[in-house]
Amino acid sequence: MTASNTKNASAIPIDKFSNVRITSIWTFLQSVDWSEPWLMALLAFHVFCFAFTLLSCKYYRIQICHFLLMVAMVYSAEYLNELAAMNWRSFSKFQYFDSKGMFISLVYSVPLLLNTVIIVAVWVWRTFSTMTELKILQLKRKAARENHKKTQ
């Protein structure tokens, strides 16, 4: 049984930069050098996007533009990954951009998609609130008509 565990453990990739055995998304993210300036800027960008998502909840048109912009950025992640893979030496210490796009998906696309999910949740909540208000208004009008008919 230990021989099979050793064989399975040897199949797990080891990160070349930190010599950490990559067994999960968490260990993958731990192997990243987060002190690089471009990663700090990316983190600041995601904090800004999240704050803008929360602050734009009351402004429907701004939120639509923000939503469409983030969806377009996620859509362009594959092209951005290819571009970054070709030019990583100009801005990074390590080559994080693999052909499958795992790094860019986790670090770039997932936070943007979480923001879009928040926006969609706000839209669904608004729709339900509007439908509830409309139904209450309809019931009040119906009751007022019935009361008006009874008094005549």
UniProtKB/Swiss-Prot annotation:
Residues 129-152 form a coiled coil. Residues 58-63, 124-152 are nuclear. The chain crosses the membrane at residues 37-57, 64-84, 103-123. Pfam families: TMEM18. One of its GO terms (cellular component) is nuclear membrane. Its main location: nucleus. It is a multi-pass membrane protein. GO terms for biological process: fat cell differentiation. It is found in: Nucleus membrane. Residues 1-36, 85-102 are perinuclear space. Residues 124-152 are annotated as: DNA-binding. One of its GO terms (molecular function) is DNA binding. Belongs to the TMEM18 family. This is Transmembrane protein 18. It comes from Danio rerio.
